[in-house]
Design a protein with these regions (language model features):
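Helicase-associated low-complexity regulatory tails and linkers flanking the ATPase motor
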Residues: 1-118, 145-153, 158-225
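Residues that line or immediately flank small-molecule/substrate-binding pockets and catalytic motifs
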Residues: 23, 126, 135, 141-144
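SF2 helicase motor core recognition
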Residues: 122-137, 155-159
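N-terminal, helix-rich and Lys/Arg-enriched segments in bacterial and organellar proteins
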Residues: 88-92, 131, 137-140
Length: 225
């Protein structure tokens, strides 16, 4: 049997993580990253889910920004929090900055006991729009305006994949512009608002009772002569 659920119903009924979208005004790189890392670590630091450490994906606008601005800033922020820089993974699709070991670790983000699982701060450039499924991804941060508006929606969706049988919440960090873009894309693609992907109250959650009907029986009747 096949059941089709919309995005809203999938979140509200536990087939995806709940989402907590946070919008930031007057975004500047360092201030935004400090707030993002502090909130992420407060919510998810020290936790594991099915042996996997929670991950944060930080999307930069370009390769050079990712490597020369975001990564050094992130290293400083982690140092101030006592978090080792070895937890950073830079995957930007450029061999100058991303080596074979980095690609291996990226592919092992969801594999317990690997170096990839130890990486919790993933710096990306447009990676993960489609086809990237990382169950241990619990947050995304996107403060630059991407070339494609649909990318804001695609990046947000990456962190909603369910893990464990618990109700868990992913966090989405956005500039105010990207927050409004996400709301608009949800309207266009799912006929819903940004509030619909936030944590619903117990009163808003719907319980469905599924009853399987037996297959119909066919009886052949013979007409009397």
């Amino acid at each position: 049997m096949v059941y089709a659920y919309g995005l809203r119903e999938s979140i509200w009924n536990g087939f995806l993580k709940d989402a907590d979208p946070l919008g930031f005004e007057n975004v500047k790189s360092d201030e935004f990253l400090k707030a993002v890392v502090a909130t992420f670590w407060e919510r998810y630091g020290g936790k594991t889910y099915e042996g996997l450490k929670p991950k944060l994906a930080i999307y930069a606008a370009g390769v050079e920004e990712a490597a020369t601005e975001v990564k050094p800033a992130l290293e400083r922020i982690l140092a101030n929090l006592g978090i080792p820089a070895s937890k950073i993974l830079l995957n930007v699709g450029d061999a100058k900055y991303t080596k074979n070991d980095d690609i291996r670790d990226f592919n092992n983000l969801d594999v317990p006991g690997t170096e990839g699982n130890e990486k919790q701060f993933i710096i990306l450039v447009e990676k993960g729009k489609e086809g990237w499924n990382c169950r241990s991804l619990f947050a995304v941060a996107l403060f630059r305006s991407p070339k494609s508006k649909i990318f804001v929606l695609q990046a947000t969706m990456r962190c909603l994949r369910a893990i464990t049988d618990e109700r868990l919440t992913a966090t989405v960090f956005l500039s105010k512009e990207n927050y409004d873009t996400l709301d608009d894309e949800l309207h266009k693609n799912f006929n819903m608002e940004i509030k619909d992907i936030k944590n619903p109250s117990n009163a808003d959650r719907h319980k469905y009772q599924v009853r399987v009907l037996p297959p119909p029986r066919t009886i052949t009747l013979k007409r009397g002569q």
